[in-house]
Amino acid sequence: MAQVQFLGTGRRKKSVARVRLVPGDGKFLINNRSLMEYFGKKTLEMIVRQPLELTKSEGRFDVLCNVHGGGTSGQAGAIRLGIARALLKADIGLRPVLKRAGFLTRDPRAKERKKYGLKAARRAPQFSKR
C-alpha cells in the first residue's frame, strides 16, 4: 500500500524547495542531510521549523526536502513555505493560523537586475565635478 504523504512547493529568491511530509516522529532530511548539518546556523533552523512549531505538528511528521538554487537564507525561506503548504494539505483547518502568521505568502522580493550605464542595479559610477 502507498504511504500517505503531503507535498508542498516553496520558492524564495532563486531557491526552490520540494517538501514531503510523511507521518513519523519529526525527523528532518534536507538533500539527504540533517537540518543542523545542512544549515549549520540556529537562526535558519528556527525559520524552517516555524510552521511546525506554530501548528504543534513537530512530532507528527517526518520532513523530507529537496532544495536547490540561491543561498542558505533563500533556501530556508523556500523550505518554510513548502512545509506550510504541505501542512495545509494535511489539515485544511490550519489555514487561518498559518495565514495569520504569514507563512502562506510567497515573499516576492528578489534581486533587482543590473542596468546598463550603472555599476549595479542602482549604484552609479563615481561622479566628478572637475
UniProtKB/Swiss-Prot annotation:
It holds the Pfam family Ribosomal_S9. InterPro entries: Ribosomal_Su5_D2-typ_SF (IPR020568), Ribosomal_uS9 (IPR000754), Ribosomal_uS9_bac/plastid (IPR023035), Ribosomal_uS9_CS (IPR020574), Ribsml_uS5_D2-typ_fold_subgr (IPR014721). Disulfide bonds: none annotated. Residues 111-130 have a biased composition (Basic residues). One of its GO terms (biological process) is translation. Residues 109-130 are annotated as: Disordered. The keyword Ribosomal protein applies. The keyword Endoplasmic reticulum does not apply. Gene3D superfamilies: 3.30.230.10. Keywords: Ribonucleoprotein, Ribosomal protein. GO terms for cellular component: cytosolic small ribosomal subunit. Belongs to the universal ribosomal protein uS9 family. This is Small ribosomal subunit protein uS9. The gene is rpsI.
